[in-house]
């Protein structure tokens, strides 16, 4: 599914991206067939992007907000260095059940921990700094997640926030739907934040990468 770029460009990019492992392809099919809102699946291109970022950073401590069916956590796990670990937060038992099954079948099952419950509570409980953070949970809390985690990025750490173009709806100032407004306000906050350096990418539904100054 393409959210921003034309379908034919998305298809070309997918065709020139290293294909996902068979287990990820199987997970994608099950997600589309059995779960509500399958468009929430990270997908081939963004999954590889996350893996590349984790690998390039040699990120040992990774935090994900929003496990969904486990595609993104498995993608990132493939880029972990020796001793690296992913903590991922989820509130849906149905989603986490799928993720746990596929994590267990992968080579990375012992390197991913799913934490059930509100992400802000998990963030506070886990403590410490993070080498890489991927935010893809409830949009209404995006600003809270950003504020909680920006100070806790490692000196060379990176934060990735998903869906920051929101199918292009952020462009329409007359669109006052709550999620659209929340994302638009967050985008404005990030670019004006003197603590951060950000780039917004037109990958999938928009991915914003942020580091601390």
Language-model features: where?
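A short alpha-helical cap/connector motif
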Residues: 1-132, 139-160, 164-213
